Structures are given as C-alpha cells and as structure tokens.
Amino acid sequence: MKITLPEFGKARVLVVGDVMLDRYWHGPTGRISPEAPVPVVKVEHIEERPGGAANVALNSAALGAHAVLLGLTGQDEAADALAGQMAGVKVACDFVRLADYPTITKLRVLSRNQQLLRLDFEEAFHDVDSTLLMNKVEQALPSSDVMILSDYGKGALNDVPGMIQRARAAGIPVLVDPKGTEFEKYRGATLLTPNMSEFEAVVGKVKGEEDLVAKGLALVKRFELEALLVTRSENGMTLIREGQPELHLPAQAHEVYDVTGAGDTVISTLATSLAAGMSLDEACALANTAAGIVVGKLGTSTVSPVELANALYTEQETGFGVMSEAQLKIAVQAARLRGEKVVMTNGCFDILHAGHVSYLANAGKLGDRLIVAVNTDGSVRRLKGPGRPVNSTDRRMAVLAGLGAVDWVVPFAEDTPQRLIAEVLPDLLVKGGDYKPKDIAGYDEVTANGGEVRVLNFEDGCSTSDIIKTIRERG
C-alpha cells in the first residue's frame, strides 16, 4: 500500500478521557540502602510528560493537528503542571477541576534507563457528575472532525454511551481506546482499538488468524461498530470490518525499548489521519508505522511527521510526486535528516519538450532530491498572456512527476516562487536561461541560509513558444 502523508494541519481532533501526569526521576544507583535491601537512587534529573488521554492529544498535536483535550483533574499542582505542558505544545485544554480529587499522577524511578519503581497517586472519579464533562463535549463537537475516547478506567468516561450518541448524531466519527471487558458501553462507536490482551479478555483465547477475524467480526456486529483494529505487539495489527476482507499489517518496530504509550500513538495517528482525509486502510497503515517508531523511544513519547516520512521512505520508497506545500516541507525535512542534498527549480513547463527534459535531468544530477515548483494556471496567464497555459496545472504537474529526474512537484500561485523558496530553503537553487544568479527569485533567502544558486543552460532549439507557433502554422 502506497502512503503519502496528508496535511495534518487541517485535522481537528477532540480527545476526551482520563488525563494523567507522568513523572520520571532519573539517577544512578551506586549503593544499597542501609535501611533495607534496596538500591539507593541519586536523583539527578526530573522529567514530566503528559500521560493517558493527555498523551493522546499530545501525539495529535505533534503531527500538526488542532487538538482539544477534555478531562477531569484535581485542583492541585499536578493539574497546573499538566495544563502548562499542554499549552506549551498548543493543545487547547478544558479540564473539569475537582477539589476533592487528586490529578492522576504516575511517578517512575529509573536508573540507566531501567524502571525500578512506579508510584501511583490517584483516586478514581467514578462518583463525579457526568454532566460536568458532557457539557464541555457538546460545546467542542461542532468544531471537531473526529473524537477520541481514551478510556483508562479512571472514571472520566462514566457516560460513554452519551458521548458516542452525541458525536454520531453530529456526524462525527468516534474512535475508542477501550478498557475492561464491558464493551457494551462502546456500542455504536466508529472503531475500537483494543490490544490483544484486551481483545481476548472479551472474546476468549484466540486460536490463530481465522479465529481472530471471526471473533473480531462477531464483536463488530454485536456492538454495531464500523470497524475493529486489534493491536498485536510483535504480530502487528489487524483491521476487521463487516463486508470487507481483513487487513493484516505486520509490525514495523526494529528495536523495542518501551511500549508505554504505544496505544496512545496508534489511536491518535489513526484519528488524525482520518480527520486529514486518509482512507481507513491508509490511516491504519500509518498508525502501524507510528507505533513502530514510538516503541523505540523511552517512556510516553510522540511521533513527528518528519519521522513518519523517514519511516515511509525506508519501508516503501514512497512520498514522491505531486505534493502540497505542507507535504513538501515534511519531505524536505526528512531528506535532510538522511543527509540528502535538495535541489530546487521552477517554471511553467506548459508543453514539456526535450529541452525541459535535458535541463531537469542535469538539475537532478546536482543533488539527491529535485523539487520542481510549477506556476499555476493563473500565474502562467499573467506571465505569458491570455492564450496560455495550453495544459492545466494538474496535467503539467502529472507529466513532470513522471520524469525519473524529478522527486517532488509543487504548485505556486504567485508570479515568482520567492515565498515558496524561502519556506523550503533548498541546498541548491537552479534556473535555466541567461539569468545572473543574483537576479533569480529566492537568491537572497537561499544564500543567507548557506545554500547555492546556479544557472543552467537550456538546450538550443527547444522552445514552448516555438512549438505552439509551429502547431498553429500547421493547424
């Protein structure tokens, strides 16, 4: 399955659930305590990260989505710390702060990246009035593309059926990371993402792939779901839907350091991808890739679009061809992480001819990746006159993307690509013709960034205008 990253910035993701604060105390262990046979950790570094539903929202925001987080906290220092962290990553938080409850906090003591102890500070919110959070959900739904329910069984989601009903009535898909064995409360959700242990706790021991699919399909029908995605650790993931063949996705992890928060990454990537316009199959495949990245990190972590682009490049040599500006910037960042030299050129390329092909082949040889920025129809018309272009923007870009020398093709609507060049900042900017480098649009921006601007010669005797003239004469 070929995957191109969507424009995550368009996605609006609402996350509701059990928010937590994860704290990590790091330090060496050089001796045993004289008070008891336990190691003494000399704490040298303290770290705090959002956990639970907060980590789900953090993962969506890390992809570039507009994330909103709703949940229950105490009126304490931990809630302030959590809110401050989320504000720092531009996640909009609207917590119900309760005076009689502590914010759920999990403190982990680590030495040499090995967890020695975990301390939990929590009291379940099971007796809290559900309307307090429901009112906030109703306010947030109209400005959301998808809703995630992140259930850790701590009590924030004590009216799951009501939340699902309101979201589905508004036409908003609901993805649920379930907890426990009572799946009845998730009836009518769009998709559930249980791990294998959670799945078997509901359906019983699974005996092979066929049994997995059969039992999964029974759950889909029983609880009126659109789909079920079972995450299976080293066995990857399986997507199950009624009336469609199952989709098995092999695990992508190369090294596993910590599975903490991997489920959060899966559901956030899946939901954000769907909100950005991907199909369910594509979104599941991308979530699988994200899971393979995050388990290679210590603790609850996030995955960036650049990391995804790099992983996709490694897996399938994809992410090339016609792109939006946002997609291009991610691809360029990923290329730079791989140490690749990025070359950029631009033009109308109205009727592609041998001169164009030769020029682009020569430009491509100057680096590892070649970007071709193409004037849109309106831009060409302003530059060339009312009779141009002959071919539309989409057609011109499709032809360019088919050339072996070209990696990425992107449109620009202005008369010059100066703004786009300033955003991309290629290592080498090339232009064909009789220009002086200093006269080329983007020269100042590229050279100020340490890049180079170079002029290449066009092949003699090749001209789009001449071709058009010849066609008209022979017309």
Swiss-Prot record:
Alphabetical UniProt keywords:
ATP-binding, Carbohydrate metabolism, Kinase, Multifunctional enzyme, Nucleotide-binding, Nucleotidyltransferase, Transferase
Q: Where is this region: Ribokinase?
A: 1-318
Enzyme superclass (EC): transferase
According to its record, what are the GO cellular component terms? cytosol
What residues form the catalytic site here?
Answer: D264
| Amino-acid positions noted as binding ATP in the UniProt annotation, renumbered to this chain | N195, M196, S197, E198
Q: What GO terms describe the biological role, i.e. biological process, of this protein?
A: ADP-L-glycero-beta-D-manno-heptose biosynthetic process
Q: How does it assemble?
A: Homodimer.
HAMAP family according to UniProt: HldE
The family classification in the record reads: In the N-terminal section; belongs to the carbohydrate kinase PfkB family.
Disulfides per UniProt: none
What is the gene name? hldE
Bilayer-crossing residues are none
The protein's name in its UniProt record:
Bifunctional protein HldE
Record's catalysed reaction(s) = D-glycero-beta-D-manno-heptose 7-phosphate + ATP = D-glycero-beta-D-manno-heptose 1,7-bisphosphate + ADP + H(+); D-glycero-beta-D-manno-heptose 1-phosphate + ATP + H(+) = ADP-D-glycero-beta-D-manno-heptose + diphosphate
Source species? Aeromonas salmonicida (strain A449)
Say yes or no: keyword Oxidoreductase present. Answer: no
The reply on keyword Metal-binding is no
**What role does this protein play?**
Catalyzes the ADP transfer from ATP to D-glycero-beta-D-manno-heptose 1-phosphate, yielding ADP-D-glycero-beta-D-manno-heptose.
Q: Which GO terms describe its molecular function?
A: ATP binding; heptose 7-phosphate kinase activity; heptose-1-phosphate adenylyltransferase activity; phosphotransferase activity, alcohol group as acceptor
